[in-house]
Each structure stands twice: as C-alpha cells, then as structure tokens.
C-alpha cells in the first residue's frame, strides 16, 4: 500500500516496545509510528526506540520516584490545583504499576486532596526508597 501512494504513512496500534515498533516498520514500511497508551507510565519508551544502548529492564523504583517528582513539579507549574491533582493521580498510577508496594503508594496519591498531600506522599515515597 505504501508503495502506491505519495503521502507519508503512519503506523499505529499496539506498539508498546521496540520489538513491536520494529515489526510494524518492517511489515508496513511506514514513515512513522504513532505511540499512544504505551507511553502512559512509560515515557522511557521513546528512549528505548531511539537509543540502542538503552535497556528498559534497567529501570528501577528510583527512576519512577524521580519521574513522579519531575512530572509533579511541571503539573504544579502549569496547571491549576484541581487539574494538577487529577493528572497526578492518573499518571502516578501508571508510573507505579508493577513495582513493589505500588498499590500502597497509589492509594496514598489517590487519597490526596491538595498539593500539600501529594508533596507529603512524594516525600514519604522518596524517603522509603532512598534511605
């Protein structure tokens, strides 16, 4: 199909790792690949696709804590409190998926009613993993 048209073709659907990406590129010869849900909780997927030396298995809970903190700082800066809290709950749940004690931390963030609650939970999470 790609060979019969003169416009860029973008592949899409169920691309959650480099192997999926390579399969769709090889099978379709598309010009690009769209990544959606696979990036939720895994912003590292883009590094995995572009850096042959990156191994997603090397990621650990410290990386998750760091990304939660960075993401929260940006949400506080650019979003009003209600939106910040809702997005924090959504994204932190994705980030924590699959890690030890994930449900405990997810519950703490989901119960947050203010920016201060999130800050306290983030500090507790950092302390528990960095000490």
Where are the regions a protein language model picked out?
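Alpha/beta catalytic cores of nucleotide-metabolism and tRNA/nucleoside-modifying enzymes
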Residues: 2-11, 15-131
